[in-house]
C-alpha cells in the first residue's frame, strides 16, 4: 500500500471547507429521489460533517474504520432518518465504538467499524446483503464533495445518489483485497464517491427495499482527484459474521 493511498484514505474522512450548497451530484450523481432513512450523516462535536454511515439496527451504525479510528464517542454526532445533512430526522449519541481489529493507520484492510448508540432511534434500519459479485447493480449515496478536486467546492445539503455496479477487482489497483472488498465502477469514467462520502452505504435493490452491500472506503487508484477510476468499498457480506458477533444482544 503506497503512502499516497493512505493520505487519500485520511482525506476522505475530512470535511471539505466551505458552506454547504445544493450542488448536484456525488461526483456525477443527483439529488436523492426517495427517502433513505438508514443513511446516517456523521458530524464532529462542532457540527461539521466528516463521514457517513448506515443504520443496521435501532442502536447500531456501520461506517468505515478510518472514520472512527482514534475517536471517542463524544467526537461523533450521528443524524439519522433524513436526506438533509443539517436538519430533520434525529440526532443520536454514541455510546461505544468498535473498530475492526484488522484496521490500522498503515494498512486500509478491515476498513469497517460499528457505532453503538445510547438509545434506539426511530429511523428504519437497512438489512445486510448476503451476496455480492461483479456485474451486480448498486447505488451509492452520500453528502460528499460534488467536484473531483479537494476543496474545489462546498458540500450538498441534500443527500446525493449515483447508480453504478460492482466490477472486476482488477480494475481497482490500489491494494485491493478481493476477499473482503468490492471494486465499484465510476460510470462514464468521471463519477463516484468523493471527499466526505467515506463510511456511507453502497446498496442493492431487493424487491421493494434496499440491502447494504458495501461501505465507502477509498479510491481504487492513487490519483489525487475523485472518480478517475473505480472506487473500493468494504464488503458487508464478507464482514457479516463479525458484525453479527459485535451487535448481538
Language-model region placement:
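Cleaved targeting-peptide boundary
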Residues: 22-28
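A conserved glycine-rich beta-strand in the N-terminal activation segment of trypsin-fold
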Residues: 39-58, 89, 107
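C-terminal subregion of chymotrypsin/trypsin-like serine protease catalytic domains
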Residues: 2-5, 40, 54-68, 76-77, ...
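Active-site region of chymotrypsin-like
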Residues: 34-49, 120-125, 160-199, 206-225
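Active-site-proximal beta-strand/loop segments in catalytic clefts of secreted hydrolases
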Residues: 42-45, 55-58, 64-67, 80-83, ...
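Secretory targeting and sorting signals
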Residues: 1-22
Amino acid at each position: 500500500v503506497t503512502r499516497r493511498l493512505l493520505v487519500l484514505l485520511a482525506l476522505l474522512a475530512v470535511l471539505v471547507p466551505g458552506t454547504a450548497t445544493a450542488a448536484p451530484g456525488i461526483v456525477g450523481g443527483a439529488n436523492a429521489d426517495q427517502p433513505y432513512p438508514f443513511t446516517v450523516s456523521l458530524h464532529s462535536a462542532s457540527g461539521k460533517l466528516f463521514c457517513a454511515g448506515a443504520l443496521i439496527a435501532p442502536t447500531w451504525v456501520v461506517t468505515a474504520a478510518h472514520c472512527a479510528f482514534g475517536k471517542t464517542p463524544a467526537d461523533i454526532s450521528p443524524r439519522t432518518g433524513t436526506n438533509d445533512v443539517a436538519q430533520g430526522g434525529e440526532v443520536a449519541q454514541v455510546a461505544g465504538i468498535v473498530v475492526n481489529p484488522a484496521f490500522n493507520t498503515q494498512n486500509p484492510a478491515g476498513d469497517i467499524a460499528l457505532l453503538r448508540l445510547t438509545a434506539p432511534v426511530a429511523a428504519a434500519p437497512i438489512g445486510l446483503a448476503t451476496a455480492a459479485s461483479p456485474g451486480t447493480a448498486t447505488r451509492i449515496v452520500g453528502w460528499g464533495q460534488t467536484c473531483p478536486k479537494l476543496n474545489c467546492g462546498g458540500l450538498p445539503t441534500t443527500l446525493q445518489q449515483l447508480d453504478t455496479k460492482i466490477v472486476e477487482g482488477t480494475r481497482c489497483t490500489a491494494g485491493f483485497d478481493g476477499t473482503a472488498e468490492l471494486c465499484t465502477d465510476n460510470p462514464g469514467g468521471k463519477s463516484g464517491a468523493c471527499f466526505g462520502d467515506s463510511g456511507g452505504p453502497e446498496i442493492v435493490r431487493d424487491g421493494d427495499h434496499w440491502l447494504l452491500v458495501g461501505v465507502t472506503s477509498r479510491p481504487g487508484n492513487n490519483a489525487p482527484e475523485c472518480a478517475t477510476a473505480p472506487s473500493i468499498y468494504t464488503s458487508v457480506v464478507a464482514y457479516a459474521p463479525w458484525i453479527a458477533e459485535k451487535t448481538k444482544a
